[in-house]
């Protein structure tokens, strides 16, 4: 099941890579603004944290000042996001077949597809939220409390993309209080 899932994700990534390279889809207004930010890195911007600018800076440093450079890490994040959802479903105790479909639905959901094509802040934010959830569920699976430093690392990374990830602390603290008083 895992091999099939990885193959489908690889085919999705290859197809969307081809779309980014050959379809001639120019940068949208938000992407152009984020790209402008990436040329002058800072710790924050008037409406967003710096993660998207740093991500675009890294992509353009590796792949040049092209649409692919701007969008490359978004495609990587979205593929890893679908795989993280698959792992989360497995760790939560779902059957492998159900976990397969969970990951596939994430990969081909509107956010999974649009987030693969365009440099938006939601992809990095959601990847980090899922990583924090995976950390908590894995600890619960072992009948332990999740390490706050690891969860905090995921929250810190997610806060570089969108500030609402700070809400995860509330859920995490409730989880610790209810399951490990």
Question: What are the language-model segments listed below?
Answer:
Residues 111-125:
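Short acidic/glycine- and proline-prone juxtamembrane loop motifs at membrane-interface regions
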Residues 1-18:
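Start-transfer (signal-anchor) and selected internal transmembrane alpha helices
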Residues 85-108, 126-127:
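Transmembrane-helix signature of polytopic, membrane-embedded enzymes
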Residues 50-54, 63-83, 115-119:
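Loop-to-helix entry region of an early transmembrane alpha helix in multi-pass inner-membrane enzymes
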Residues 22-34, 44-55, 64-68:
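Extracytoplasmic catalytic/substrate-binding loops of multi-pass membrane glycan-assembly enzymes
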Residues 9-10, 99-107, 155, 159, ...:
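Short helix- or helix-capping micro-motifs
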Residues 149-153, 164-179:
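Transmembrane-embedded, aromatic-rich helix segments that form part
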């Amino acid at each position: 099941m895992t091999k099939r899932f990885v193959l489908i994700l690889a085919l999705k990534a290859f197809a969307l890579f081809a779309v980014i390279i050959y379809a001639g889809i120019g940068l949208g207004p938000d992407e152009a603004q984020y790209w402008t930010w990436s040329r002058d890195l800072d710790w924050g911007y008037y409406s967003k944290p710096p993660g998207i600018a740093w991500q675009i800076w890294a992509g353009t440093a590796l792949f040049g000042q092209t649409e692919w450079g701007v969008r490359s890490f978004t495609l990587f994040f979205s593929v890893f996001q679908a795989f993280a959802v698959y792992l989360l479903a497995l760790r939560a105790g779902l059957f492998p077949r159900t976990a397969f479909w969970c990951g596939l639905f994430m990969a081909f959901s509107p956010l999974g597809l649009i987030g693969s094509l365009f440099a938006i802040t939601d992809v990095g934010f959601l990847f980090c939220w899922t990583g924090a959830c995976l950390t908590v569920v894995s600890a619960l699976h072992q009948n332990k409390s999740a390490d706050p430093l690891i969860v905090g690392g995921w929250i810190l990374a997610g806060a570089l993309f969108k500030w609402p990830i700070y809400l995860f602390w509330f859920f995490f603290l409730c989880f610790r209080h209810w399951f490990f008083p």
